[in-house]
Amino acid sequence: MTWRSEHIWIDLISGSRKKSNFCWAFLLFLGSLGFVLVGTSSYLGRNLISSFPPQQITFFPQGLVMSFYGIAGLFISCYLWCTILWNVGSGYDLFDRKEGIVRIFRWGFPGKSRRIVLRFLMKDIQSDRTEVKEGVSARRVPYMEIRGQGAIPLIRTDENFTTRREIEQKAAELAYFLRVPIEVF
């Protein structure tokens, strides 16, 4: 979501609370829970899953391996749910032409550096750069080239833009607002 006025431009970044992340975390939790239940039922010799008799899988090695994969999947699912809960990666990009300041804010993982804030002056912006790579794993990333700090990515590639035209349009609008040249690679 973008909000603009004559002197201020604010881009809100959604972070990890997206439908796809919810789906992956939920499916991974269910699948890994199923693996743990199958491994446990093969160890106990009891039928914990009604559609699956425990005699079909021996505990060593199949049940043990399924339990291991299930526990690993539960850890990964827990990690995904924590990133969703903490909304890692969300934040905003603020461009204030009146004050001459750019502020990029993102939420990180809990700890000392939970709040990630980058501040710099607009006069230090050299250009608005867009990197476009076509192919199987296509990437479209807008960067801001800062004097002394290099290129800073503005948004994640999977967030808002689906076509090359959309990202180039957004980069052109931002370059016009900031009054800097635009580069497309």
Swiss-Prot record:
Disulfide bonds: none annotated. It comes from the Eukaryota. The chain crosses the membrane at residues 21-43, 63-85. GO terms for biological process: photosynthesis. InterPro entries: PSI_Ycf4_assembly. The keyword Thylakoid applies. Pfam families: Ycf4. The keyword Repeat does not apply. Its main location: plastid. Keywords: Chloroplast, Membrane, Photosynthesis, Plastid, Thylakoid, Transmembrane, Transmembrane helix. PANTHER family: PHOTOSYSTEM I ASSEMBLY PROTEIN YCF4, PTHR33288. Belongs to the Ycf4 family. This is Photosystem I assembly protein Ycf4. The gene is ycf4.
